Regions:
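Generic detector of short, well-ordered, non-transmembrane alpha-helical segments enriched
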Residues: 42, 164-165
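Ferredoxin-reductase
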Residues: 1-34
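Structural motif
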Residues: 11-14, 29, 123-124, 165-167, ...
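Glycine-rich phosphate-binding loop signature in dinucleotide/nucleotide-binding domains
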Residues: 8-9, 159-164
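A generic local secondary-structure boundary/capping motif
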Residues: 2-5, 17, 89, 155-156, ...
Length: 175
C-alpha cells in the first residue's frame, strides 16, 4: 500500500489487518500521502477527526464503482513495485542462496515473494501458508508472527525436506 499510494499519487490509504496478531485483533492502519503511517502529532489529529464522525453512509459496491468512489488498481502498480525494488538491489557477487518463503497466510506472496523471484532468488514457497486466509489455520495460537519460532515450523519443515538452509517469513500484511 505504501508504494501504491506514492505510485498513484494518492492522498493516503487504509489497511484493515490483524497484522501478526490473532484474527480477532483486526484494526485499521492509515497511511499518509507520502506512504508512511501517521505519527505524532498527526496521528492524534486523525484520531480526533475520526471521533467526530457521527455516522457512516453505505452503498452497494457496484454503485461505488459506477460513481468513481471505488476503482480497481491496475496491474501496472504491481509491475512498478517489482521494478522499483529490483532497481534498488545490486546484483549479488555470487548466486543467491535458495530460500523457503512463507507469507503466513497473508499478502506477502505477491509482494515480497514476487520481488525475490524477479531478483532471481531461488524461492520455494511454503505451500499451505502461501494461501491467503485470515483465520491463519496452520499457525499455532492463530498468531502469525514471524518472530515466533512456532509460526515458522511449517517453513522450517519445508526447508529441511528440500535441503534449504534459509527460511524467510513475513507477517500477513507484509509490513
Amino acid at each position: 500500500l505504501s508504494f501504491a499510494i506514492r505510485d498513484l499519487n494518492a492522498s493516503g490509504g487504509l489497511v484493515i489487518s490483524a497484522s501478526h496478531n490473532p484474527p480477532d485483533d483486526n484494526g485499521s492502519k492509515f497511511y499518509h500521502g507520502h506512504g508512511g503511517q501517521f505519527v505524532p502529532p498527526h496521528d492524534q489529529t486523525l484520531a480526533d477527526t475520526i471521533a467526530e464522525v457521527e455516522r457512516v453512509e453505505r452503498m452497494p459496491f457496484d454503485r461505488g464503482v459506477s460513481t468513481g468512489l471505488i476503482r480497481e488498481i491496475s496491474e501496472s502498480v504491481h509491475v512498478n513495485y517489482i521494478a522499483a525494488n529490483i532497481a534498488a538491489v545490486s546484483p549479488p557477487a555470487r548466486p543467491w542462496i535458495p530460500v523457503v518463503f512463507t507469507p503466513l497466510h497473508g499478502t506477502a506472496h505477491t509482494s515480497v515473494g514476487d520481488v525475490l523471484e524477479a531478483a532471481g532468488v531461488p524461492v520455494t514457497a511454503q505451500p499451505e501458508q502461501s494461501v491467503p486466509d485470515g483465520r491463519f489455520p496452520t499457525v499455532p495460537f492463530k498468531s502469525p508472527n514471524p518472530e515466533s519460532a512456532e509460526a515458522l515450523d511449517l517453513a522450517i519443515q519445508t526447508a529441511q525436506e528440500n535441503g534449504i538452509d534459509l527460511v524467510m517469513g513475513c507477517d500477513p500484511d507484509a509490513d
